[in-house]
Amino acid sequence: MKRDVRILLLGEAQVGKTSLILSLVGEEFPEEVPARAEEITIPADVTPEKVPTHIVDYSETEQTVEELQGEIDKADVVCVVYDVSEEATVEKIRTKWIPLVNGDTKRGPRVPIILVGNKSDLRPGGSMEAVLPIMSQFPEIETCVECSAKNLKNISELFYYAQKAVLHPTAPLYDPEAKQLRPACAQALTRIFRLSDQDMDQALSDQELNAFQTSCFGHPLAPQALEDVKMVVSKNVVGGVRDDQLTLDGFLFLNTLFIQRGRHETTWTILRRFGYGDSLELTADYLCPPLRVPPGCSAELNHRGYQFVQRMFEKHDQDRDGALSPAELQSLFSVFPAAPWGPHLPSTVRTKAGRLPLHGYLCQWTLVTYLDVRRSLEHLGYLGYPTLCEQDSQAHAITVTREKRLDQEKGQTQRNVLLCKVVGARGVGKSSFLRAFLGHSLGHQDAGEPSVYAIDTVQVNGQEKYLILCEVAADSLLTASADASCDVACLMFDGSDLRSFALCASVYKQHYMDGQTPCLFVCSKADLPGGVPLPGLSPAEFCRRHRLPTPTLFSCAGPVEPCMGIFTRLATMATFPHLVHGQLQATSFWLRVALGAMGAAVAAILSFSLYRVLVKSR
């Protein structure tokens, strides 16, 4: 919605333009009227719509044609004033003023026009019969107001309607010739209806209608008012009410009726509550609310975000089988301009028999939020998070983690989403490693484009963590501008071709050797015979020299089954980033924790025994 309104008054000389402005400001008819009033600004707190309003007068004797055109170009709405007692001024509306306003304007959309019949005190019968044909001819005319500057009749109403024509314009909503909603308006209202239909039965129950009414207007409908609404719809629209519930056709009819009766601000209130702007597109402020993620921090869905997206899952899981079919996914994404995850099931998560289970669905939301929080905010906006959850914005569903440097200083991370970069030469088995993480066999092929990401949950010390694997070609990290940052690095080499180890070693030395990122070397294709040793340090010797864990064997084929424990180990290393020098052998690490606790207990017992000896010696 516009932040201020600029109203321009035009018309023939002596029709009372200046008198109208001065009567509004002074609340009395001026005895002396200048040729032209100065521009007046009405503060926001004294206007019905709480928007600053600028009122601009025009005088043909004081202003040039160029100055007039400049004022028209700046105006948000034009009030064409005529004298109800002078028919010639009415005819000038059609032949002079409307062509001048919208015939030569270069801005594109037509400027809304309010017809103002002044001096109604001189003609009690009014002039509506004369102006109705003009209103039918020019759709940009919003309304006609008859008033009297002398009697102060309808003065404030005149400027209210002018303000309303800017803030709640009819033209984007309604086609007066076809007497129906414009396509963009119908599309926006259809999306709003689908978001409000919580049980997916293609109709709004009394409970859903009252939730909608409360969200948009701050209070529910009285029971009798609710029945009256449904009665009006059922009398005018076949199928508008079904089983005592309002259908989409009935909902669209109601909004058409509001507009036809001059209450288009009602429809605009609904549209703006659900994020729409003057162009009937979701606004940038709505889709991308302010959310700062400082360097070294990351974004995650919080419990409110997970509750909402799970609620959307359950809403569209119509067969209650715990998974979304392609048709159910299409239903979920029907309120988006396009399917955000592509035409196929995401290849980044676990799927089941061509369906997306809740676990994989939550993983996909987690991945999108971590990689591109702006995109995640957009998706939450399309699903109606701010309105349905009664929050200012969908940023309420996001948590920004503390800086990684603080995690490293404290020796433990509070993050629930961990990034592991799987680095290696081409052909060492990185893609197979990602597929194994998702429980796929070596020969598994995804329906869509393969992804360099995979995400699943792992248990770390009894807590569930989301682990993201990101496949990275080792040679791409050897450039000066490469970004190797992550929570844990998995450096993969082919055990049957040890030349691939040299690349991993180079990446380690360039990016990780002097840092605090935990690293694990992984020897892939462990089912194949070992490669010919090369001059220099062997992988095991290299790891020992750099105080790294011994390379872990991994295979997706042959007699060696994929060891899923490797993924838990990577997540554990990321959770405890201070243990970067091979200290995180699963058994020895927890053994030291236990021994430390035991040592503390023994020390306490010895101290207590010594205390008893000292007491007895006294």
From Swiss-Prot:
Mg(2+) 2 binds at residues 431, 471. It is a single-pass type IV membrane protein. Keywords: Calcium, GTP-binding, Hydrolase, Isopeptide bond, Magnesium, Membrane, Metal-binding, Mitochondrion, Mitochondrion outer membrane, Nucleotide-binding, Repeat, Transmembrane, Transmembrane helix, Ubl conjugation. There is a cross-link at residues 96, 119, 164 (Glycyl lysine isopeptide (Lys-Gly) (interchain with G-Cter in ubiquitin)). GTP 1 binds at residues 16-19, 59, 118-119, 121, 149-150. The chain crosses the membrane at residues 593-615. The Miro 2 domain is necessary for efficient ubiquitination by PRKN. This is Mitochondrial Rho GTPase 2. It comes from Bos taurus (Bovine).
